[in-house]
Amino acid sequence: MQGLIRELRRREVFRTAGLYVGIAWIAIEGASVLLPAFDAPDWVLRALIIAAIVGFPITIVLAWIYDVTDKGIEVQGDATDTVVVPFGGRKMDFIVIGILSVALIFSVYMNLTSGPDAVENQEPVSVLIADFVNETGDPLFDGTLEQALQIGIESAPFVTGYRRDAALQLAASLGPVTALDEAAARLVAVREGVKLVMAGSIMEDDGRYQLYVRALDPKGGEILASAQVDARDKLEVLAAVGELAGDLREELGDDSLDREKLRISETFTAKSLEAAQAYAKAQSLQYNGKYEDSVDFYREAIEEDEHFGRAYSGLALSLGSLGRDDEADATWKLALQNLGSMTERERLRTLGLYYSRVTRNREKAIESYEALVEKYPADDAAHNGLAIQHFYTLNFDAALEAGGKLLEIYPGSVMGRSNYALYAMYAGDFDRAVAEAEKVRELDPSYFKAWLPVAMQALAAGDAAAARQAYEKMAAISGRGASTASLGVADVAMFEGDYAAAKPVLTDGIAADEASGSRYYAATKYIALAEAEFATGDVAAGLHALNQGLELSSRDAQKIPAALMYITAGELDRAREIAAALVSQLQPTSRAYGMMIEALVLLEQGEQVLAIDKLTAALNLADLWLVRYYRGRAYLTAGFAAEAMDEFTACMERTGEATAVFLDDLPTFRYMADLPEWLGRAQGGLGL
């Protein structure tokens, strides 16, 4: 072995190998930078690397066989009297070491500065799919291909599809439109700021099907991308739509395409056309509030495809909206069992809906929507869902951030901008709320909620007359606007202490709500009426109104003020029942309210310190405006004026949360009425 090493050294093999490795290393690193700059094909760099690898053993062999002399290159084994060029020596060692060092430094520099392979952050692309032109005459394709195409293109992280049913509804409001054809889709896209319209067609030729789709600029109609595929028979049509979606994604610049995952046939069974068509009809009916009718079509879809996960989740939502909670819970279990039949995007959306609407597990819902946003940053439903969940956890800054991301994708989204205005209102940023609400009214003058921030800003500024004017404008828009406005007008009167004026407004509003079937609105007004009756000393009338409200709705927004009135009426057991129901829920805000009621019962019994401890524990669960307000009152009752002043000051600073204290966009500014008095008492207790 030692002899071999000596011979390798004598023949300069080690030095030649080091020199070769250093030069090849530098060449490859340089090529990895220069070739992409000149749009060279990927195979050029691969060929260079392969050549370098293949060349290494060849160089070693040549170094063993040949030597460089003053007469040129000679075979080392030949006898010669020529003088060998001084290729060796310490000087050459330094040269080889230097080249290797340069190669190493260059490589480290390239890795540090370039980082991991960067994924190009593409701008979000919103897409509205127009009705396919069905030239086959087969109605089975109507409303089916559009849904399949949307599922396929939404697998691209930067693409989000605009709801077709919402688009059709908007198109109908803009003109005499009954179908979402290319012209109607372009009109809606321009109005809503949607970046692309996809218009497709399907035709049949001797049992084979040809599908063609164009991606259009909605303003000028320029074709930005197109794709065409064929299907051998009807059963292959949905799979062909998946291939079509893949081609369009590639043309739009999607580098994450995995055609095996994209194939629509993985999401639908062989009976998918029938299932997909029934599902599309169910979705449209559900969107338009026809829940009973949607149930039949969801079940039809499930009969055609028993593993149709999205149909189960849609059915569960409709059943829940109809109050059929037991059926809804059972259906949700089936939806969760069939998550595997969904695309990753649909799976995360479904989990977000389940956590937010069924279990009310806000933290898990936020996790699902955050995962959805991370993987599909253009998903408008993800940003909207994330914003709403942050809102319900009282993180208004995070809600504004997520809501702002939604508006970056859909700047023309009326609902998105209205929500953004309301988040600002709850955060107490009334100027921003009013400015955004004005933009909402510019987009859609019939959006009645855009007047709520205006009314609340006026009340916060002490201008009750301006608040009434805002409610008058709201009432003139629609029936729901009139319902909210009547509660708002009564709320203003109660804030001013004019309970006598509030009662007839509430009574008339209740009658209108009951006539229109608006149970929640009627229940909320009954609770407000009960508060007015209690304030004027008519406890019996107040309890009667309270019980009527609870019969219509027993959500937190009704139960919590009901419990407060039960305590006032001395019916502590009924208050405890409500508290027990609230603390047994998963949602932290509900449990915090339950603990607040328990604390107020303790306070009523003279247990001031225990009540304060209970209120503090409630705040640790959820920092709610109403809990902080009552902790201030408890502190003051117990003689802790400084602590009470801190609580009341915090409530004054968080006026936005009192605008609709139960986060349902229904006015409760009346709860601010006696806050200045309580703050004054606390300050008086400190001699201020």
Task: Please state what every model-predicted region is.
Residues 581, 617-621, 629-657:
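Active/binding-pocket-proximal capping segment
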Residues 135, 148-159, 188-191, 247-255, ...:
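Structured segments of extracytoplasmic/periplasmic soluble domains
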Residues 276-300, 305-624, 640, 672-675:
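Extended non-membrane alpha-helical scaffolds
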Residues 1-107, 192, 219-222:
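An N-terminal, helix-rich hydrophobic module
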Residues 265, 654-673:
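Acidic, Ser/Thr-rich low-complexity linear motifs
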